[in-house]
Swiss-Prot record:
Domain Radical SAM core positions: 146-378
Gene this chain is encoded by: miaB
Alphabetical UniProt keywords: 4Fe-4S, Cytoplasm, Iron, Iron-sulfur, Metal-binding, S-adenosyl-L-methionine, Transferase, tRNA processing
Compartments, record wording: Cytoplasm
EC number of this enzyme: 2.8.4.3
Classification via Gene3D superfamilies: Methylthiotransferase, N-terminal domain, tm_1862 like domain
Catalytic activity: N(6)-dimethylallyladenosine(37) in tRNA + (sulfur carrier)-SH + AH2 + 2 S-adenosyl-L-methionine = 2-methylsulfanyl-N(6)-dimethylallyladenosine(37) in tRNA + (sulfur carrier)-H + 5'-deoxyadenosine + L-methionine + A + S-adenosyl-L-homocysteine + 2 H(+)
UniProt binding sites for [4Fe-4S] cluster 2: C160, C164, C167
Protein name listed in UniProt: tRNA-2-methylthio-N(6)-dimethylallyladenosine synthase
Lineage: Bacteria, Pseudomonadati, Pseudomonadota, Alphaproteobacteria, Sphingomonadales
Length: 446
């Protein structure tokens, strides 16, 4: 490629999980420090970072679609500088560089702290790829947090050692690593100083976090949550995503004892059938999962539950799928996420026999989503008449309207004289399938 001008504006487009949202925010902070400004809404950017997800095949296809859209009908001098980051970059970096000559750089999720130097190389006319996995070095090199939304993400752990047979995460994010306790306390403090009232702890397997406090005492995630909750200016703590194998007694107790830990738990089960769970290498049964949920509900009776499901895993029969519907009927999730199985190259499940036909997966997904939507609507309807604290996150669709989140992660719309970042008391007066309408009562904290 030829040398080009230094970009003056940027846009980061993140796909997929909350971890990618966090990574996208950190990349934006690095670009800010480099003197590159966010492109105004509706205007083309000089630099576009596609922060990609590799969980599903459609997400990979979308990357190439976006590259084509960004370059269509444009000469090299008019087209933006393109960086592909994230898990697709990690898994398919060489193919991207070969297939998409318009891409200037490919950077994996554990190497994006080197993005500023790669931009300099692109300006000099050099394409580059960096998919190393030094996650600890990445966090040490990132800039300090200087701005925050009322609800902020904090990555405490990366990677996964579970090796579910359908999942690419161990190959794209690497082995489990935990960030040091002191670094997390410092970053959380910076987020709160920058305006965060709520922090969501993130990890591919967040409850696997381990560390030592300032006195050298061993801690799990429950201990970290208890320490974070001591900050009087931090009002709420959440975490996602967990594996049932790493939910210990202390974490269960923390849900009942730490008021700032919100009454919401996202705990994927994936299937309600034990044979399928074993083929997935999930290391739990449907029964052990249900008993675990019972313990969480005993500790925090108002707990809202969320989960993940995969339909059409190789070999799944109709009877096995119906076991998934049974577990949905028993748990009654407040919200959940469901997907058709998507074979990912390099995973054991991709080469398993008895791949389920697409039309069967489509029909099963439709039935599962109908059950999950029914339960979410019922949970929201059951909230009507309740008074709760809502964190104001953004303006609504008309003047004076606001959107915030309840403790149970429900979207709540209401009118009133408030500001983004306020904690307010709201009476929930009307339920929709995906949100609730509320009546403002009072402001708790500004």
């Amino acid at each position: 490629m030829k040398p080009t001008h230094s970009p003056k504006t940027y846009r980061v487009k993140s796909f997929g999980c909350q971890m990618n949202v966090y990574d996208g925010e950190r990349m934006a902070e690095m670009l800010d420090e480099k003197g590159i400004e966010p492109a105004p809404e509706g205007e083309d950017a000089d630099l576009v970072v596609l922060n990609t997800c590799h969980i599903r095949e459609k997400a990979v296809d979308k990357v190439y679609s976006d590259i084509g859209r960004l370059t269509k009908g444009k000469t090299q001098t008019k087209a933006p500088m393109i960086a592909v980051a994230g898990c697709v970059a990690q898994a398919e970096g060489e193919e991207i560089m070969a297939r998409a000559p318009a891409v200037s750089m490919v950077v994996g999720p554990q190497a994006y702290h080197r993005l500023p130097g790669m931009i300099d190389a692109a300006v000099a006319g050099k394409r580059s790829t960096d998919t190393d996995m030094p996650a600890d070095a990445k966090f040490a090199a990132l800039p300090k947090r200087r701005k925050s939304a009322p609800s902020a993400f904090l990555t405490i752990q990366e990677g996964c050692d579970k090796f579910c047979t359908y999942c690419v995460v161990p190959y794209t994010r690497g082995a489990e690593i935990s960030r040091p306790f002191s670094a997390l306390i410092d970053e959380a403090k910076k987020l709160v100083e920058a305006g965060a009232k709520e922090i969501t702890l993130l990890g591919q397997n967040v409850s696997a976090w381990t560390g030592e406090d300032a006195k050298g005492r061993a801690l799990g995630m429950a201990g970290l949550i208890r320490e974070l909750a001591k900050d009087p200016d931090l009002k709420r703590v959440r975490y996602t995503t967990s594996h049932p194998a790493d939910m210990d007694d202390e974490l269960i107790a923390t849900h009942g004892e730490v008021e700032k830990l919100m009454p919401y738990l996202h705990l994927p089960v994936q299937s309600g059938n034990d044979r399928v769970l074993k083929a997935m290498n999930r290391s739990h049964t449907a029964e052990s999962y249900l008993r675990l949920l019972e313990r969480f509900r005993a500790a925090r009776p108002d707990l809202a539950l969320s989960g993940d499901f995969i339909v059409g895993f190789p070999g799944e029969t109709e009877a096995e799928f119906e076991d998934t519907l049974k577990i949905v009927d028993e748990v009654r999730y407040a919200q959940a996420y469901s997907f058709k199985y998507s074979p990912r190259p390099g995973t054991p499940a991709a080469t398993m026999e008895r791949q389920v036909p697409k039309e069967v997966m489509d029909e099963r997904l439709q039935r599962l989503q109908a059950a999950l939507n029914r339960d979410q609507a019922a949970f929201n309807a059951g909230s009507v008449g309740r008074t709760c604290e809502v964190l104001v996150e953004r303006t609504g669709k008309h003047p004076g309207q606001w959107l915030g989140k309840s403790p149970w992660l429900q979207s709540v719309w209401f009118d009133g004289d408030v500001a983004i970042g306020d904690l307010v008391q709201v009476e929930l007066v009307e339920a929709g399938p995906n949100s609730l309408a509320g009546q403002l009562l009072e402001t708790v904290a500004a």
